[in-house]
Amino acid sequence: MKPTLRPPAWMQSLMLQYVPFADAASPDLPLGRLFRLALFQLSVGMTMALLVGTLNRVMIVELQVPAWWVALSVALPLVFAPLRAMIGYRSDTHPSALGLRRIPYMWMGTILMFGGLAIMPFALLGLSEPREGYLWIVRIGAALAFLCVGAGMQITQTAGMALASDVAPVDKRPRVVALMYAMQLVGLIVGSAALSVLLSAFSPQKLIQVVQACAVWVVLLNLVSLWKQEARSERRGQREPDGFSHQWRQLMALPRMRRFLWTVGLGTAAFSMQDIVLEPYGAQVLGLDVSLTSRSEEHTSELQSLRHLVCRLLLEKK
């Protein structure tokens, strides 16, 4: 058994007082391992900043892609959002020969994100200058790229949050989940700031380099995040043939559940619609360049982080 090195009592007291989410750590889940696990949310946040903070404006303004196609492409990642319940259930009951449940799904999502981001810039450039007779092929490629990224984000997030709940003690789970979503906001802030710097002098070649660099960072961050996070089980799980449908019927039997799901779905759709037009509005009406419109997503995420901090302080006073 390896000896564990723990900081002295005075350092632990300072960490609990000044380090964000230090109280989410536990002896079984140290702070270093917890922050390392949260890196998958950092990669998801960076990818979201690229999709809704930069590419929507670049496609409409610089590449002259029709706005309806941009709206459809950016909305495609949300297609897989309703499937997160099924993804979570399948990871709960995954009959892995390696004794792992969450890691295979997180790695599958990482590969989908990488593949979608790798082909995305070429599909976008093809949309901007389509050859006669090949437009439908380019549109299928662009839709496939956005679908892969969206599916990868949903699968990675669902399995990752389930893994965080698995490794965290019951009394620490609310703080661990809050840390995961805070790390996603950090990813949005960092990604938007990096995009505003890298695309200050926009060119199609620079766009290809930035998007593919984002694909590489997704793989690296998720690889570090997943490393030795899930303990292997010696026996394989067993999946019931109609287990998910049975669980879904039980969920729908709850009072007002359908109304709740419709409210969440419509609210999410309304919130996503403004993301599509906000950056193009800044470009065409306010005359902002790619760097400044990308920075607007950074400021939005900073305000969201401030809102979470204020809510936490108010709840702690009660």
Give a label for each model feature.
Residues 297-318:
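Single conserved hydrophobic/aromatic residue that forms the stacking wall/gate
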